[in-house]
Amino acid sequence: MMSSLSDLETHASELTSAVKTIISQCPRQNAASRSRTQPLITSSASKEAHRAQQSILSTISGLQKLLTSPTDFLHHLAVQNQLLACLQWLGEFQVLACIPLTGTVPIKDVAELAGVPETHLSRIIRMTATAGFLDEPDPGQVAHSALSAPFVTKPSYLDAVMFLAGTIAPSALQMPTATQRFGASLRPNETAYNLALNNPATFASTSEQRPKLQRQWPAFLQYGTSDTDDRVTDLLSRLDHFRRGSISVVEVSARSLDRATTLANLYPSINITVQIASPAGPTAWSPAHPNPIRPPTPGGSHKHDDLRALTASTASTTPASSHNHTHTHTTNSIPQASNITIQHRLPTAPQPITSANLYILHLPSPSPTVPFASLATHILAELRSHLDILRSNPSATLILTPRPLPEPSAVHSEVEASARLRDLTLMQLANEREIELAEWINLLSNVSDSMGRLVVVNKIQSRESTVVLLEIRYQAYNR
């Protein structure tokens, strides 16, 4: 009991502190000037405000764990179940697009436009409004809220909902039957997904034939499972390497310029080469299902943050270098980060930069569309492409940024919940799983030559993220 009371006091203190931070960081607006669809914390808010926002949500989660009774728990599950069903219904009939982003509209008009019964629509709107999704400011009128409007302006959110409702939830509910029928099978066509969708084909082969799945799965992965790496930059900033003056850094398999720009601004004396997959070649790990390019983090927006646009512009204007696998473009258009160079490199190709001080290598995470054996093969190939460099350049360091499945209670509960969500999703869709830290280190132990091998010399991690930085050096054998 004393421990629980102590935790309650801690959560209360953290909540108060975070709320004060948001109040101090966010400009005050009167109710008349603030749009109904404008969120309290906008994407342009300071990093401190966004950190405080996450702290509040984390603290609320902790408070719920302390205070929730069995009845509360069941009620919450029932409400979430109905909310998901309502969102699927709204998405199926494209109702959200029928509601103007500003102002109100009669529910009757929306029902006629969407071709649905007005009584059904009214009841569903009133249910979702309890969660802040849509609003009924006056009886019989509907308007978008700050939570619902982005589902119109950013369709990927709706893709994630439809995938959750149409694929993930039905598959999850078939876990008991899958265990009864298939036991501990690892075959990708003997899964809860196969039973739920009554489909004998694997999820990977099915998604190859269905563009909708190709669109929905990455959206769900990014927005439904908190599959972000926004803590990597914070962890990298803890490295002593960046405080050693003028050093050369290569970021391999980057998804945006956010991280490089942040590091370049924090440490102006470093020079960073950002390597992305060549637009002419295959994607890093699955030609049919590339990893989604993540949007810039809040407050870090830049016209080159989306590498799809960047790739298209540089591919047509910059000649290939003498190396068959790369070509380079210097981002002179970025005055605040002029020490950044962009280079296209095919995954697992020989590393063309051999004299850098630091190599930051972003490796892929497991996916239902890529078997673990194939993933491991690509990871080993990428590591081996840097082995010779580390051997010939003893001062060079390789930094890996894996997101392993954490040990129980090793990270904050909501962070662990997201990791367990991804792990169970992989099992239900394809009998795949997240990789544990020991397995990552075991993979590294297989990267060697006749003179030495790669070893982990340091680990950096945080309770706020599942990402672990592995500092790798080449170690010669004792003869």
UniProtKB/Swiss-Prot annotation:
Q: Phenotype on deletion?
A: Impairs the production of monodictyphenone and of any of the intermediates of the pathway.
Localization terms from the record: Nucleus
Q: What is this protein called?
A: Monodictyphenone cluster transcriptional coactivator mdpA
Q: Which UniProt keywords apply?
A: DNA-binding, Nucleus, Transcription, Transcription regulation
Gene symbol? mdpA
Matches recorded under InterPro entries: SAM-dependent_MTases_sf (IPR029063), WH-like_DNA-bd_sf (IPR036388), WH_DNA-bd_sf (IPR036390)
Q: Which Gene3D superfamilies match?
A: Vaccinia Virus protein VP39, Winged helix-like DNA-binding domain superfamily/Winged helix DNA-binding domain
The question of whether Cell inner membrane is a record keyword is answered with no
User: What region holds the HTH iclR-type domain?
Assistant: 77-147
